[in-house]
Amino acid sequence: MAASLGFRGAASGLRYWSGRRRPVGSLAAVCSRSMASKTPVGFIGLGNMGNPMAKNLIKHGYPLILYDVFPDVCKEFKEAGEQVASSPADVAEKADRIITMLPSSMNSIEVYSGANGILKKVKKGSLLIDSSTIDPSVSKELAKEVEKMGAVFMDAPVSGGVGAARSGNLTFMVGGVENEFAAAQELLGCMGSNVLYCGAVGSGQSAKICNNMLLAISMIGTAEAMNLGIRSGLDPKLLAKILNMSSGRCWSSDTYNPVPGVMDGVPSSNNYQGGFGTTLMAKDLGLAQDSATSTKTPILLGSVAHQIYRMMCSKGYSKKDFSSVFQYLREEETF
């Protein structure tokens, strides 16, 4: 989520590519696999994010070989002429470039290492890109297993949400072998306007976890500020306008406001349906908590945000967008 948070430009030390700039580095040095431009690409995971991401690859001329644990979501792709595989292993047998977009660490482990996983049929030299948001340690373990099979694994989680996935303006944070970055960039640039090389495998996940922790904190802060203003008699649209002209401005206030009726086209104005689920935010904050524990880093606000989103999940908000924290604050008498 939130490509606007922390990724307005290239950070120091990061390899960076924007859809508005020329790619970094020469494609001439990339292996023949990545230069096979319009050969089929495998895509596994066609949920809220994966579906529009896959469609953007198709728009750029890439034929796809698709798989999802729920066959019904593949129907529209099959009707459009794309291939649908019977398992992740089947995808790996037919494609040497595969992108996965899955909900959790456990899902990624199953898709890669399970009984019918990618590693059962992966070809030497294949490029495997995981855009799921998972524990960095899981990415590192998967990379080791993939390397044993003679293939390449890169983690490339995304930020920007469903809207950016649809428009092809995602931010990708990429971790892996640097000389494979251009090969990954060829595909990721079809789905995102910002593709950043962050370092070794797991670095992309670490960057994404930091971003989502900040996003959760800023969303809670925006919801609290808006709620306070409304209870003080301020018009919510006026308050949002003031915030967005002032130092409190952030992505949660100017692009994804949590108050119903303040903005069109956002989950808060659609009963908090669609978008980025509260369950997923709680999961990502759990990853941040684990990372903080392993690195002995204090995350005081991150820990509180984790507690809030866990409480929301236990009180019926699990399937609503994470901006529903505003509704939660309004309904909780204890706050």
Curated annotation (Swiss-Prot):
Pfam families in the record: NAD_binding_11 (PF14833), NAD_binding_2 (PF03446)
Binding residues annotated for NAD(+), in chain numbering: 39-68, 102-103, 107, 133, 283
Effect on the protein of changing D68R: Decrease of activity with NAD, increase of activity with NADP
Key word Zinc present: no
Superkingdom of this protein's organism: Eukaryota
Transit peptide range per the UniProt entry: 1-35
One annotated GO molecular function: NADP binding
Tissues and organs where the protein is expressed, per its UniProt entry: Higher level in kidney, liver, and heart than in muscle.
Catalytic function, reaction form: 3-hydroxy-2-methylpropanoate + NAD(+) = 2-methyl-3-oxopropanoate + NADH + H(+)
Main location: mitochondrion
Subunit structure: Homodimer.
Entries under NCBIfam families matching the protein: HIBADH (TIGR01692)
Protein family: Belongs to the HIBADH-related family. 3-hydroxyisobutyrate dehydrogenase subfamily.
Protein name: 3-hydroxyisobutyrate dehydrogenase, mitochondrial
